[in-house]
A protein has these predicted regions:
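Extracellular glycan-interacting surfaces
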Residues: 15, 20, 24-27, 32-669
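N-terminal secretory signal peptides that target proteins for export/translocation
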Residues: 1-16
Length: 669
């Protein structure tokens, strides 16, 4: 049960254990490291895993993500800045941040790898996060819980997949205090008695344990708990150590005798009992917050009664209460980012300015207003979809009404200004000045399908497949979908198509005049008569993951894939592997910048932009953005890229680049 508690839904790079061994010191650190690199524009929000404040200045707040990146705020969470990156890749989940209450320059960050589940690190900073190092004794451990003793801040306790570990010297040395052959493993939560650092509670993926003597002896504390309960969070009352709260997949439990027996708390619906975090108000111990997968719950009478104080759609990962002012509550959430309350959790507003953690799949600059841009995102359900900025990315608003939580893979704009979106379930159009997207999924020629009556006309079926790419030409709209290639000659009012040469699962389509190229993950099909007839381009059988196709103005076809970038100068009859300055594999996108007659490419292995002025025969290494890139565009003379975790990023205004105007038109997944 517990092993699957956190599903991090972004594509990430695999970081081998061998590579991790090369990074015993922090690989990225504070704000100076980001100077001169590209700027993240948004959209604001996304997943937040953890929050922590400086004990001597609670307006100084730190934020942990699911990709190893830390953010900080110096104004109480009103604005955020990218602060540091921990680990060598993008797979470290920072679920716990701890700051020494006696010496706030000492910080700790617990990490576990979403890729391997079994590895991770414990990071330590002595200078308020300016520099970080891994603690060697904990290197490689998947650390799921971390606590500092309130009575002795030199004492830390960490919970990992392989047991419980304790340090009595601020992390310099560590001892495993759980027996290697015991059931005390797969630790999910840790709590230390605020008055006695030898009393430690450990929640596992199967009930909880307690030691009264610093780990020399442990005993099961499960009386009153439902068997097979994953214990996600444990807190000990700051004023009365006999009172202990524990949250599990079966509900919330309270003990009034230091964990010897528990009583299940009533009043919360079963669906909301997956409580990821419990947090006690530091100024009022009768107030306890429960962050669940169905909203935030609050008790003001020490657990006798509970009320939900947010919408049930809010998934809460962490709760922070200002020690100076109990009215000020902040939440780390999935998809919504940081939510802040100034009235004791009666109401919340987003507080994400400067913080973005979104997987952007599409960037579109408005044809008539260069300051207006649109982006499509995935994985954020009702809080995602499409976002629009009308001030060149300084501010964003969600514009997803009618999409009903769909992922958006591609965005295009018709000649009349209408927007077209390809989603994980069909296509949608947003008319000019409209506030709601409308479906455009009528298919008129699916042989053998049952007739369905609509208000406008009779159609054979409704397209519900994934739409990975859309191409709009002066005469035809084309859609690459998981159910085939579809075309429309009436601006999307109806579509016809399906399988092409027996292939259906298309991921990309591009057209130049009558030349059309459409790709599955392993094949490229080419038409020289606008889709009337097709030919298979006979790619190597080694090609397994095509990410997108592109066509230059002189008719050369190119594609980006896991196996590298390939070019055909003869309409798909033959292919050559483009290298000569370009990485030989893991190309995430290749774009043709029509206005500047050049190719731009990105790779999943680097944040560098690659450029070719000779149709791919040779490549020059461009700027290192500091971000993992997926797709590249040129907007108002500056390069802009989508990322899997950091929204969209833009080239610095003073950075040397040859582009002057235009847009690179390739979109890949």
């Amino acid at each position: 049960m517990g092993a699957n508690r956190d599903m991090i839904s972004a594509s990430k790079h695999f970081v081998s254990s061998k590579a991790l061994l090369l990074v015993l010191l922090a690989l990225c650190c504070a704000s100076a490291a980001w100077a001169g690199q590209w700027t993240a524009l948004g959209p604001d929000g996304g997943d937040v895993r953890s929050l922590a404040y400086d004990p001597q200045n609670p307006d100084h707040i730190f934020l942990g993500t699911s990709t190893g990146t830390l953010f900080s705020s110096t104004d109480g969470g009103k604005s955020w800045a990218r602060f540091a990156h921990l680990g060598s890749g993008d797979d470290y989940v920072i679920d716990h941040l701890a700051i020494d209450p006696q010496s706030p320059n000492k910080m700790y960050a617990a990490a576990w790898s979403v890729e391997t589940q079994q590895s991770g690190d414990l990071f330590h900073s002595e200078d308020a996060g300016q520099t970080w190092e891994t603690l060697p004794a904990m290197h490689g451990k998947s650390i799921r819980a971390l606590a500092i003793s309130a009575s002795d801040s030199k004492t830390l306790v960490a919970g990992a997949v392989d047991g419980v570990f304790r340090s009595s010297d601020s992390g310099k040395s560590w001892q495993k205090i759980s027996a290697s052959n015991s059931d005390i493993h797969s630790i999910e939560s840790i709590a230390v008695d605020p008055k006695n650092s030898n009393v430690i509670y450990a929640g596992t993926w199967h009930l909880a344990w307690k030691t009264d003597d610093g780990g020399a002896n442990w005993h099961h504390i499960s009386k009153g708990m439902i068997e097979d309960s994953d214990v996600f969070s444990i807190i000990v009352d700051s004023t009365n150590s006999s009172v202990v709260f524990a949250s599990a997949c079966s509900g919330i439990y309270k003990s009034q005798n230091a964990g010897e027996t528990f009583q299940k708390i009533q009043g919360m619906p079963f669906s909301a009992r997956r409580t990821r975090v419990l947090k006690q108000d530091p100024a009022n111990p009768a107030i306890v917050y429960a962050g669940t997968t169905e909203g935030l719950w609050k008790t003001i009478d020490a657990g006798k009664t509970w009320n939900r104080v947010t919408d049930p759609e809010v998934v809460v990962n962490d709760v922070m209460v200002d020690p100076r002012n109990s009215m000020r509550v902040m939440l780390a959430t999935d998809r919504a980012g940081v939510l802040a309350s100034t009235d004791g959790a009666h109401s919340f507003l987003t507080s994400n300015h400067g913080y973005t953690h979104r997987y952007v799949t599409a960037i579109l600059a408005d044809k008539s207003d260069p300051n207006t841009m649109y982006v499509g995102v995935v994985n954020d359900r009702e809080l995602g979809g499409v976002f629009v900025s009308r001030d060149a990315g300084q501010h964003w608003i969600q514009n997803s009404k009618g999409l009903d939580g769909r992922d958006v893979f591609t965005l295009k704009q018709a000649s009349n200004g209408e927007l077209v979106a390809g989603t994980n379930r069909g296509m949608f159009i947003l008319a000019q000045h409209a506030t709601e997207w409308s479906p455009i999924n009528d298919i008129v020629n699916r042989t053998g399908s049952r007739y369905v009556k609509t208000g406008q006309h009779e159609v054979h079926s409704i397209l519900t497949a994934r739409v990975s790419d859309i191409e709009i030409t002066p005469t035809t709209w084309m859609a690459a979908t998981s159910a085939g290639l579809f075309t429309s000659s009436n601006q999307g009012k109806s579509w016809n198509g399906g399988a092409v040469m027996g292939k259906e699962d298309f991921v990309s389509v591009r057209a130049q005049g009558k030349l059309v190229a459409v790709a599955t993950r392993s094949d490229v099909l080419v038409s020289k008569d606008n889709g009337v007839t097709w030919q298979d381009s006979s790619l190597s059988t080694s090609i397994s993951s095509i990410r997108g196709v592109s066509i230059t103005s002189d008719g050369q076809i190119m594609f980006a894939s896991r196996e590298g970038a390939f070019r055909s100068p003869n309409g798909g009859a033959g292919w050559e592997h483009m290298q000569n300055g370009l990485p030989d594999k893991n190309i995430s996108s290749i774009s043709y910048d029509q206005n500047n007659q050049r190719l731009l490419a990105t790779s999943t292995e680097t944040g560098v932009v690659f450029e070719s002025q000779d149709n791919g025969q040779s490549w020059t290494r461009g700027p290192d953005t500091g971000y993992p890139l997926r797709n590249i565009s040129v907007v108002q003379g500056r390069m802009m890229a989508s990322t899997p975790f950091d929204g969209i990023v833009m080239q610095p205004e003073n950075e040397d680049h040859s582009a002057s105007t235009g847009t690179a038109t390739r979109r890949t997944n």
